[in-house]
């Protein structure tokens, strides 16, 4: 029973991670309104004619439907197990699956509002933030299921780990803000912003620079955290943050090509997942 629940939770988490990347591809390619302002239908149809923007957005919606099914199944399975069905004893897997279901409902609502309002930046940012929280919750559901990791004692997360997690989440949100307000090209050059430590230009430069400052702070903090920790998890975070910095530098210095923009989101999602795992 435990293994099935854990496998289902990991499957849902993996699909959620892939959905985050696909959502970024929708934004990067300008396909957010590939289905028009219709929701849940696409251009008023269940099976619309598929040009490239429509194909990308429709694929994103189908992937979201798959994630919805997995999360709903996980919550239903958790409820079934908590009632002790199919076994001779009560077996509680925890309530994180219910939290994931609530986050999924919020995510679906934000997705609908985002499309209906023609992609305002604030809803797109909230949409990504909620997706990251959903991913984290599913990872917690998989890792903290009783019996999922036999023989490994559970210790409560220390404050440095929680600070790293909070800093990572804020960095992700400022990255979404930078991308969705059109500030990605406001800071040329790397690591400085237009060769300035304190940009003197528009508010878009300040938004972009704030995202970078959070990223630099995250790197310094996780190195300090890893050096103090006796666990290997923080060092995996350090490695992924270094990779993310390399992708970001290449992206900015090469004029923001779409593949590197997508890679930036993919590695950013991996950093977030690694932070969650390192905290547990």
Regions found by a protein language model. Give the residues of each.
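Polytopic transmembrane helical bundles with strong interfacial aromatic enrichment
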Residues: 1-280
């Amino acid at each position: 029973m435990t293994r099935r629940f854990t496998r289902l939770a990991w499957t849902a988490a993996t699909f959620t991670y892939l959905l985050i990347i696909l959502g970024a591809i929708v934004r990067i390619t300008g396909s957010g309104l590939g289905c028009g302002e219709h929701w849940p239908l696409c251009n008023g149809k269940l099976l619309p004619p598929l040009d490239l923007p429509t194909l990308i957005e429709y694929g994103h919606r189908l992937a979201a439907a798959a994630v919805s099914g997995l999360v709903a199944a996980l919550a239903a399975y958790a409820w079934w197990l908590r009632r002790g069905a199919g076994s001779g004893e009560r077996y509680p897997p925890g309530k994180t699956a219910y939290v994931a279901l609530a986050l999924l409902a919020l995510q679906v609502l934000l997705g609908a509002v985002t499309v209906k309002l023609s992609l305002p930046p604030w809803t797109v940012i909230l949409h990504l933030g909620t997706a990251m929280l959903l991913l984290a919750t599913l990872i917690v559901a998989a890792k903290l299921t009783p019996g999922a990791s036999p023989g490994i004692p559970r210790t409560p997360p220390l404050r440095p780990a929680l600070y790293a997690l909070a800093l990572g989440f804020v960095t992700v949100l400022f990255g979404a803000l930078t991308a969705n307000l059109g500030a990605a090209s406001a800071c040329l050059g790397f690591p400085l912003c237009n060769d300035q430590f304190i940009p003197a230009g528009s508010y878009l430069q300040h938004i972009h620079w704030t995202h970078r400052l959070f990223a630099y702070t995250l790197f310094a903090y996780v190195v300090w955290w890893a050096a103090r920790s006796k666990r290997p998890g923080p060092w995996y975070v350090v490695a992924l943050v270094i990779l993310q910095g390399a992708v970001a530098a290449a992206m900015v210095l090469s004029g923001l090509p779409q593949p590197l923009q997508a890679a930036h989101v993919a590695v950013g999602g991996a950093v977030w997942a690694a932070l969650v795992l390192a905290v547990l």
